């Protein structure tokens, strides 16, 4: 009995020593090139986050959360359904209004009278204020001494705003969707076109004078 106990103790000791001498499970995998397991990634302190980290974090949140359509970027928003029953085939602008609904749209506005950039700032600011009072959300950017950009968040109202702008005394021109609309203040070009016609009329003035001289010569002959 004592011998059997000693034999069991020796066997247990040998088994335990073999287990202790075995290498860890990942030891062989680490020795083979290209199959080494990467070390665990250390979490970055949020105080050290840069713009790229914040963008990735925001994308992760957007995937997990349901975002309302109004908060989505414009290119990710679904297009508004078009009611074809309200379209007027005789007015192409009505089709454009429907397709631009809920989309950002820009138009170029030219101020007449060769203004300075400061004058353009003041004049277009008055127009923007009038549109704001009429409940139109319009942003304005000066892009030249006589030119400004009017940007709308809802492009379906662009043609109504265009009609307002072209009726202003100092509006020379409005460019919208590649189409140029002359403004009330853009009449200087038409006046320049009419000047040569006036000059032609002046060139034709000598003709009636010649007829008067002929009449005088005829009256003298009658006297003789």
Curated annotation (Swiss-Prot):
Its main location: endoplasmic reticulum. It is found in: Endoplasmic reticulum. Residues 28-49, 178-224 are annotated as: Disordered. A motif (Prevents secretion from ER) lies at residues 221-224. One of its GO terms (molecular function) is identical protein binding. It comes from the Eukaryota. Disruption phenotype: Disruption of embryonic polarity and mesoderm differentiation, likely resulting from a primary defect in Wnt signaling. GO terms for cellular component: endoplasmic reticulum; plasma membrane. Glycans are attached at residue 192. Disulfide bonds: none annotated. Coiled coil: none annotated. Chaperone specifically assisting the folding of beta-propeller/EGF modules within the family of low-density lipoprotein receptors (LDLRs). Acts as a modulator of the Wnt pathway through chaperoning the coreceptors of the canonical Wnt pathway, LRP5 and LRP6, to the plasma membrane. Essential for specification of embryonic polarity and mesoderm induction. Plays an essential role in neuromuscular junction (NMJ) formation by promoting cell-surface expression of LRP4. May regulate phagocytosis of apoptotic retinal pigment epithelium (RPE) cells. Belongs to the MESD family. This is LRP chaperone MESD. It comes from Mus musculus (Mouse).
């Amino acid at each position: 009995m004592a011998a059997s106990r000693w034999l069991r103790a020796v066997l247990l000791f040998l088994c335990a020593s073999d287990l202790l001498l075995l290498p860890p499970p990942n030891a062989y995998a680490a020795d083979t090139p290209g199959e080494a397991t990467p070390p665990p990634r250390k979490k970055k302190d949020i105080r050290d986050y840069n713009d790229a980290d914040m963008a990735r974090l925001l994308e992760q949140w957007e995937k997990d959360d349901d975002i309302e359509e109004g908060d989505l970027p414009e290119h990710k928003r679904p297009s508004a359904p078009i009611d074809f029953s309200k379209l007027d085939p005789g007015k192409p602008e009505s089709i454009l209004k429907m397709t631009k609904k809920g989309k950002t749209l820009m138009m170029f506005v030219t101020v007449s009278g060769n203004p300075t950039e400061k004058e353009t700032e003041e004049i277009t600011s008055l127009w923007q204020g009038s549109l704001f009072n009429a409940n139109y959300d319009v942003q304005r950017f000066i892009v030249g001494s006589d030119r400004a950009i009017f940007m709308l968040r809802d492009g379906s109202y662009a043609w109504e705003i265009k009609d307002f702008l072209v009726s202003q005394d100092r509006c020379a021109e409005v460019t919208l969707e590649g189409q140029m609309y002359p403004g009330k203040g853009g009449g200087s070009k038409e006046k320049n076109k009419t000047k040569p016609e006036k000059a032609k009329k002046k060139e034709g003035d000598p003709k009636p004078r010649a007829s008067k001289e002929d009449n005088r010569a005829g009256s003298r002959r009658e006297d003789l």
